[in-house]
């Protein structure tokens, strides 16, 4: 019986870490935006929907670039537009 060595390339480790880094960045950004926005009820409902969509993206196991682009389109841009809307309506 032979023992086959298993090698894990650095690129594999990088592709596994990138979605985790993106997930933490989105979570931290969401927390900062919640603190800055005074209309808590509106933003928390959007945040819950955003996190659910984010989990669906995570479950799809896309490539890191696709995962990053989908995160921007589905999570960051809607939250940014809602932030701009709230800021404009408060003035």
UniProtKB/Swiss-Prot annotation:
Q: Which InterPro entries does the protein's record reference?
A: Papilloma_E5_alpha
Q: What superkingdom heads the lineage? A: Viruses
Instruction: Name it.
Output: Probable protein E5A
Family stated for the protein in its record: Belongs to the papillomaviridae E5A protein family.
Q: Which UniProt keywords apply?
A: Early protein
């Amino acid at each position: 019986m032979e023992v086959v060595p298993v090698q894990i390339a650095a690129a594999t480790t990088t592709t596994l870490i990138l979605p985790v880094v993106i997930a933490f960045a989105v979570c931290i950004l969401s927390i900062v935006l919640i603190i800055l926005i005074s209309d808590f009820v509106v933003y928390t409902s959007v945040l819950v929907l955003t996190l659910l969509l984010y989990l669906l993206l995570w479950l799809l196991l896309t490539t890191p670039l696709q995962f990053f682009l989908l995160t921007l389109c589905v999570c960051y841009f809607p939250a940014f537009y809602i932030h701009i809307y709230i800021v404009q309506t408060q003035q």
